[in-house]
Design a protein with these regions (language model features):
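Sec-dependent signal peptide recognition
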Residues: 2-8
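Active-site neighborhood of phospho(di)ester-bond hydrolases with catalytic His/Asp-centered motifs
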Residues: 97-100, 125-135, 154-156, 189, ...
Length: 281
């Protein structure tokens, strides 16, 4: 019940940001959400892959800027429904991944989800990374070797610079190991670049220095823009302790939520409540 309430609050908040006169007309092709799969108007399929086992609640202590009164008013005293998620994309005959989760050695379930769909790591042609935290790049390696033998990897140049060239060595061991393993297949982009399959990389910095959102047709993959959608959809000014720069994260959240509302975009987020999609109305 708590999860349903939280998702309803999130969807209502996004819908409230738009006016009826700006809604898509009946003649326009619209995306279709069916369970854990979103089909875009251009035929691209986006499939949610659950990476965490069981249910996931973010503790209210993750959001110290939120008052106890606000948490109580939203009915979130038990925690804020969330997930650890990745997303598959099937476009132009290729299977692609947005982020790779925790990794099987840390309890990640991504590979199990792929197996259920009849896919293996060799099926993946491209991996797009929203940022370099361990629950997003943890699935890149298996037994210290690249898991995705045929995949090209796309990552923010800003994120790469911050983690690989500027971060103290005691904080970037996993990041260096992953980037070195894929160095010959790594493509660094700038914000605003159009990548393969028409995906546009958008500035979503704050959670990490180069945190990226990806826009594809009616979809916006928002990474870790929100860790508690039921709270942050209505109060984007509230950041979580996971955000490396809380002020920048709040600015990005407000800007991107407004952008998604104005363009009627579905959002897919790595910590949104299951099944990790938020509709635009």
């Amino acid at each position: 019940m708590l999860r349903k309430l939280s998702l309803l609050l999130a969807c209502t908040a996004l819908a409230a940001c738009t006016s009826d006169k700006s809604a898509p007309s009946a003649e326009q092709a619209v995306p279709e959400l069916n369970g854990n799969q979103l089909t875009l108007s251009d035929g691209t399929s986006i499939v949610w892959l659950k990476d965490n086992a069981g249910d996931r609640l973010m503790p209210r202590t993750l959001f110290p800027e939120a008052s106890d009164l606000l948490i109580s008013e939203l009915g979130l005293q038990e925690g804020i429904p969330a997930s650890v998620s990745t997303f598959l994309m099937h476009a132009d005959g290729e299977w692609c991944l947005f982020d790779t989760g925790l990794g099987a050695s840390h309890g990640g379930q991504m590979l199990s989800g792929m197996t259920e769909l009849g896919l293996t790591p060799d099926s993946i042609s491209i991996v797009y990374l929203t940022h370099f935290h361990g629950d997003h790049i943890g699935g890149m390696l298996q037994d210290d070797q690249p898991l995705f033998a045929h995949a090209q990897v796309y990552a923010s140049a800003v994120e790469y610079q911050a983690w690989i060239n500027e971060m103290p060595a005691e904080r970037n061991g996993q990041q260096r190991q992953v980037m070195e393993a894929y160095q010959d297949r790594l493509h660094l982009f700038q914000f605003g670049d159009t990548l393969t399959h028409g995906i546009v990389a958008l500035d979503a910095v704050g959670h990490t220095p180069g945190h990226t959102a990806f826009e594809k047709a009616e979809l916006l993959v928002i990474g870790d823009l929100m860790h508690g959608a039921a709270l942050q959809m209505q109060h984007p000014e509230i950041s979580g302790n996971y955000d490396m720069d809380k002020a920048k994260a709040a600015e990005s959240r407000e800007r991107i939520l407004k952008y998604a509302a104005e363009k009627h975009l579905f959002m897919a987020g790595m910590h949104l409540p299951e099944p990790a999609f938020i509709a635009n109305n």
